[in-house]
Amino acid sequence: SEAENDLMNKLFTAYNPKVRPAEK
């Protein structure tokens, strides 16, 4: 689901900070 994708994306970026620049 879209919500699950968002959660997984957050977890992924949390462990891979280089994947996406800090948004905040």
Swiss-Prot record:
Transmembrane regions listed in the UniProt entry: none
Membrane topology: Multi-pass membrane protein
Location in the cell: Postsynaptic cell membrane; Cell membrane
Location, primary (coarse class): membrane
Catalyzed reactions: K(+)(in) = K(+)(out); Na(+)(in) = Na(+)(out)
Keywords noted in UniProt: Cell membrane, Ion channel, Ion transport, Ligand-gated ion channel, Membrane, Postsynaptic cell membrane, Receptor, Synapse, Transmembrane, Transport
GO biological process: monoatomic ion transmembrane transport
Cellular component aspect of the GO annotation: postsynaptic membrane
Top-rank taxon, per record: Eukaryota
Family of this protein: Belongs to the ligand-gated ion channel (TC 1.A.9) family. Acetylcholine receptor (TC 1.A.9.1) subfamily. Beta-1/CHRNB1 sub-subfamily.
Description of how the protein assembles with itself and partners: Pentamer of two alpha chains, and one each of the beta, delta, and gamma chains.
Function: After binding acetylcholine, the AChR responds by an extensive change in conformation that affects all subunits and leads to opening of an ion-conducting channel across the plasma membrane.
The protein's name in its UniProt record: Acetylcholine receptor subunit beta
Encoding gene, per UniProt annotation: chrnb1
